[in-house]
């Protein structure tokens, strides 16, 4: 079998794709890089917004045409597969294999049968499963929990991924040991609400540490860098900020979604906190981590959002001064309370507000990134940038960074760089040695001769 996997959505989907891919390899499958090479195509889907659902529909339409011309098995997994909406799509486009987020380990059973296979149960065996580590990568994801116990009115995740189930700490640490042995230097702990780790359906689990203490455990493992996502403000405790401050491996980066700056909108979203409570968390974080890099999620145009509500979101952005933000127009998802009970705003209103928020974000990102010029940053470089004479990666604070290759630093690794230029979306620097001096840059070839039409410029 030649299998090709396509992933839409979040980092948890990326982790799940790796899990299923490793299962396929264990069954003897070859993983190929394109649909044309494959006789089995598996799509890992996202259902949080309408746009990725539309992409899946389009892709399945193309694959159905290919099925009419050659032997091809088509599978769909992930959040959309768990929904009636996704199951209707699967029927329409003649999908052969359908796996929900809780039935990923059924992939072998699905491929053994000669008829259509649907696996949509939430199975306990998934939580103890430890996939083999990715090979040749410095970064890896590590799922510490699945599902969510919150019920935000706009969110389909509790339906698609089920109630929260925390993985046993022994399984987490065993998987971490495998990642370390494979050369991973940065791990991101994943969950819908990592701060609630160890408290499932409101009950503290015996033998499970708090998330703050899990951070301390992971930070003492020998891993070079630790990050985590996503956090819910309702469950963020000051002890998490304290654990970050006292654990050198944990990066000074917090992604804390706010969604709106208006208490009225937050109530309609059922977010369970107020603007004031959220700002108190920000103050706690900065008390322990004065140089913390802060990112957030914001939904624009939630049903009933007035111009006054939106102005409160803009003012919150200024009050916090985020380094980065993931900003989205509200997307009504069938099956959610907001879809059932609230009337949507006109598309043009939502789009105009999003443009104003993006302008605000660019202003703050430019200001924050400019402050990094002249500083020394630890950067994890993944590999070649668009111009192969440069390396790309990110700082401990998740800033995308580009540097020219230098003697002793021409490939992936963690290095130190002096930042010399910044844009709202990128830092540019030069690699330095332990003595603080610039490392000699490697000779550069003519970009045209190398076939590079858009070399990155260091300015």
Swiss-Prot record:
Q: Where do the annotations place [4Fe-4S] cluster 1 binding? A: 10, 46, 79
Q: Which residues form the Radical SAM core domain?
A: 134-367
User: What EC identifiers does the entry list?
Assistant: 2.8.4.3
Quote the cellular component terms of the Gene Ontology held in the record.
Answer: cytosol
GO molecular function, one example?
N6-isopentenyladenosine methylthiotransferase activity
**What Pfam family does this protein match (any one)?**
UPF0004
Which cofactor is essential here?
A: [4Fe-4S] cluster
User: Which intervals hold domain TRAM?
Assistant: 370-433
Binding residue positions for [4Fe-4S] cluster 2: 148, 152, 155
User: What residues does the MTTase N-terminal domain cover?
Assistant: 1-116
Q: Supply the InterPro entries for this chain.
A: Elp3/MiaA/NifB-like_rSAM, Methylthiotransferase, Methylthiotransferase_CS, Methylthiotransferase_N, Methylthiotransferase_N_sf, MiaB_methiolase, rSAM, rSAM_horseshoe
Q: Which reaction is recorded as catalysed by this protein?
A: N(6)-dimethylallyladenosine(37) in tRNA + (sulfur carrier)-SH + AH2 + 2 S-adenosyl-L-methionine = 2-methylsulfanyl-N(6)-dimethylallyladenosine(37) in tRNA + (sulfur carrier)-H + 5'-deoxyadenosine + L-methionine + A + S-adenosyl-L-homocysteine + 2 H(+)
Tell me the keywords, alphabetical order.
4Fe-4S, Cytoplasm, Iron, Iron-sulfur, Metal-binding, S-adenosyl-L-methionine, Transferase, tRNA processing
On cofactor binding, the record's note says: Binds 2 [4Fe-4S] clusters. One cluster is coordinated with 3 cysteines and an exchangeable S-adenosyl-L-methionine.
Which cell locations does it reside in?
Answer: Cytoplasm
- Assembly behavior: Monomer.
NCBIfam families named in the record: miaB-methiolase, MiaB/RimO family radical SAM methylthiotransferase
**Function summary:** Catalyzes the methylthiolation of N6-(dimethylallyl)adenosine (i(6)A), leading to the formation of 2-methylthio-N6-(dimethylallyl)adenosine (ms(2)i(6)A) at position 37 in tRNAs that read codons beginning with uridine.
Question: Which family, according to UniProt?
Answer: Belongs to the methylthiotransferase family. MiaB subfamily.
Q: Output this protein's name.
A: tRNA-2-methylthio-N(6)-dimethylallyladenosine synthase
Recorded source organism is Deinococcus geothermalis (strain DSM 11300 / CIP 105573 / AG-3a)
The major lineage groups are:
Bacteria, Thermotogati, Deinococcota, Deinococci, Deinococcales
